[in-house]
Amino acid sequence: MKNRFIFILFLSILINYGVHAQDYINSVGLRGGLSQGITYKHFVTTTDAVDGILAMRWGGFNITGLYERHIDAFDVDYLYFFYGAGAHIGFWDGDSNPWFDENRGYTVIGIDGVIGLEYVFREIPFNIALDWKPGLNLIGTTGFWGEELALSFRFIF
């Protein structure tokens, strides 16, 4: 029943907004990589956006907020290069994380960078993005985490 409701909601949004993928203000979708989750992006200017990510990994989750700048890439229509920075807070289960020494919960707070490419489809209201989001944990289990390479698929509106 829940899946049917989500599908009907998604379909009604798609029909009501029509096809206008050339320009968009908001997007929501799935992010996949070593961490999987959801992503929501909102443009605050024509080039700058805020991106919120809720990702799950190692029996816990991570909340990330990023500020991103978008510029045209390689003279290809609807292809954008983006870069930015932000912060995260994560809550992890030590039993599920191979890098933690003790079997207890961990909380980390840190800063992030992001660099990537995004393509906006003209014919359908979707985009696809590939990015690398390294992070540096400053509080909790400190250290650099550079393996966050991800592919995101978003519905734009």
Where are these regions (language model features)?
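Short loop/turn motifs that connect adjacent beta-strands in outer-membrane beta-barrel proteins
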Residues: 20-25, 47, 72-80, 121-126
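Residues that define the transmembrane beta-barrel architecture of outer-membrane proteins
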Residues: 24, 32-36, 59-63, 79, ...
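Residues on the lipid-exposed face of transmembrane beta-strands in outer-membrane beta-barrel proteins
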Residues: 30, 38-42, 65-69, 85-87, ...
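Outer-membrane beta-barrel translocator domains and adjoining extracellular loop/strand segments
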Residues: 65-66, 94-101, 140-147
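Bacterial N-terminal signal peptides
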Residues: 8-16
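Flexible, solvent-exposed loop segments that connect beta-strands
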Residues: 48-52, 91-107
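Gram-negative outer-membrane beta-barrel proteins
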Residues: 36, 60, 73-75, 91-97, ...
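Transmembrane beta-strand segments that form the barrel wall of outer-membrane beta-barrel proteins
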Residues: 22-34, 44-58, 85-89, 130-138
